Amino acid sequence: MPFIDIRLAAPCLPEKVSQIAARMTDLTVEILGKRREVTAAVVQCVAPGHWTIGGESLNLAGVGSFFLEVNVTEGTNTPAQKAAFVAAAFDAAEAILGRLDAASYAIVREIPAEAWGYQGRTQAARAGQRIGVAA
């Protein structure tokens, strides 16, 4: 049940927003092994002049940037999966948005199963139900 938060320092063109949300969802499914039907994504656009790296506006730098955070249940992905996701996310964002500053970030944030959920139930409760244990 990942939640993907994507912030772009780029013009907010509807086709780019759709492409980036779709591609990051695909990577979450393909690399992290998450279920597409419960993967949600939000894309926010920030004017490049409002995004700085090293104290310099991206307007002046002539490049774009992004911040991506995908929230997953703790312990459900290996270090290799997380590293592959971070690399693929940067490559995908650059393919869609054009040249990006190296300080463009992708984070796989692990949240304890008892600390989050969807449809009113924690992931721990869902796991307990699957194995027949009260959570």
Language model segments and positions:
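A domain-level signal for the structural core that forms small-molecule/cofactor-binding pockets
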Residues: 1-135
